[in-house]
Design a protein with these regions (language model features):
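Basic K/R-rich, polyanion-interacting modules in nucleoproteins and related proteins
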Residues: 123-179
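Ligand-binding face of N-terminal immunoglobulin V-set domains in extracellular IgSF glycoproteins
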Residues: 1
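Long, internal scaffold/assembly segments composed of regular secondary structure
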Residues: 47-140
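A short beta-turn/strand-edge loop motif at beta-sheet boundaries
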Residues: 44-51, 174-177
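Low-complexity, Pro/Ser/Thr- and charge-rich linker/hinge segments at domain boundaries
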Residues: 4-33, 242-247
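Aromatic-rich carbohydrate-binding modules that target alpha-glucans
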Residues: 63-78, 167-215, 227-247
Length: 247
């Protein structure tokens, strides 16, 4: 029986790339999307029929479900292959991730409102609001990633970090009656499962969720899913100037 599986890449650098992120010229996407322009510099490799034999994939923030494939070089400049698409290489900019830090498991901080120490630690985050119609605010996030760390151990955070039940809550003016809401991040490899699904509490008028997580610094956001349609930004909003990693 398979216990777990994980996708990985074997990387062998054969060429250089030059990548830039631009706003789209198409005004429909000017405020919300990013267009990736790039060049492939072959160095000592000779690309024969690159439009047929060269396969290009772009990923946003190491998330495989974001990939754009099969872009063809538009023209050649000296030895460089140039890709200067507008809409064909577009991504939603998204928003900076929310975050919390439980490295000091007994203490509150900027984004933690309360810690219950009476049993297995329970960490209550401050209430989040939907950001779809808010202005962009820069936040130096780690693009959905997480880092295990603790101030309570003496040597190795990965083995000495403790666990805590982290309580999430989302207040939203939007109606998500036909959508499922999830807590989203690399902490579970961006999966949508019953464990990171949120449930509506009508008495508090909040969506709530609880995750058992090891001490550390975590990025997260809230996303919605309606049947087979996934929307990563209808709660957090999307901005063309958001900082992202592309590869």
């Amino acid at each position: 029986n398979i216990i777990f599986s994980r996708k990985f890449c074997i990387y062998d650098k054969k060429a250089d790339t030059d990548v830039n992120v631009y706003r789209l010229q198409n005004m429909e996407f000017f405020k919300t999307h990013q267009s990736i322009h790039f060049s492939i510099i072959p160095n000592n490799i000779i690309f024969r029929e690159p439009e047929k034999r060269l396969k290009v994939t772009i990923l946003k923030n190491y998330q495989w479900d974001s990939q754009i494939n099969n872009l063809k070089p538009q023209y050649k400049l000296n030895s460089k292959l140039e890709y200067r698409y507008d809409t064909e290489s577009k991504f939603e900019g998204g928003n900076e991730y929310l975050y919390f830090d439980t490295k000091e498991i007994r203490s509150t901080n900027q984004n933690i409102s309360y810690v219950n120490k009476s049993k297995l630690y329970e960490t209550y985050l401050k209430i989040d609001n939907d950001r779809k119609y808010g202005n962009y605010t820069y936040n130096q996030d780690i693009n959905g990633n997480f880092e295990i760390r603790t101030l309570n151990g003496s040597q190795n955070s990965k083995t000495e970090a403790d666990y805590t039940w982290v309580h999430f809550s989302l207040a939203s003016k939007m109606n998500f009656d036909k959508n499922s809401i999830y807590i989203y991040g690399k902490f579970n490899n961006y999966k949508l499962t019953e464990k990171n699904k949120m449930y509506y509490n009508p008495s508090m008028e909040l969506y709530e969720g609880v995750l058992l997580l090891k001490q550390g610094f975590y990025n997260y956001k809230y996303i919605s899913k309606k049947i087979d349609s996934l929307n990563k930004n209808n709660i957090s909003g999307s901005h063309a100037i958001t900082e992202n990693d592309y590869l």
